[in-house]
Amino acid sequence: MPKLLDLYAKYGIKATFFYTGYIAKLYPEVVKMAADSGHEIGSHGKSHLKENGFDIMPYEKQVKHLEYSKKLLEDISGKQVISFRAPALRVSPNTATALLETGFRIDSSIASQRFDFFLSFGSKKKIKFLYAPRLPYRTNRNNLFIKGQSNLVEIPPSATIIPFAGTT
């Protein structure tokens, strides 16, 4: 991590580092190092366990996982956490509401034009990635995949072999 942070500093790059609660608890010094270098710390949920996928979790459990990871990351970093990326990019219609309720303002879980959905968890549900907007947008309060008027902004990550294809 120090080499990566040095490289980013050399070129004036600021990034968002997404950590699961599990990793943050094991390696708090890594989270703190990124935060102290001026980078944003984002939540990546509680863990990557299959049963912790936001596409299968009930709303109440999503809220608990978000509250847990947000508080842990804020306690370690000393900074407010407002960005989220779902583990394995697995979300449900309830995820947008859960994010808003727990104080998140940015989501980065909808990788438009992602083509690995046949090979990953929740693959049938990921077909929505093919029609999601490719540029940042305000989400619908009940659906991260479509534009709306909520206070949650979706910043789609590029997730194709050609780096620029998911962001143009």
Summary of predicted features, one role per range:
Residues 1-37:
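Active-site beta->alpha N-cap acidic-glycine motif
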Residues 3, 8, 46-47, 64, ...:
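A structural signal for the main folded, soluble domain(s) of proteins
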Residues 8, 17, 44, 69, ...:
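Conserved, mostly hydrophobic/aromatic
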Residues 16-28, 52-60, 85-93:
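Acidic-and-aromatic substrate-binding clefts and catalytic sites of carbohydrate-active enzymes
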Residues 25-41, 94-107:
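Short, electropositive alpha-helical surface patch
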Residues 45-53:
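Conserved radical SAM core fold
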Residues 62-73:
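An active-site-proximal "capping" alpha-helix that borders the catalytic cofactor pocket
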Residues 74, 79-168:
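Active-site-adjacent pocket scaffolds in enzyme catalytic domains
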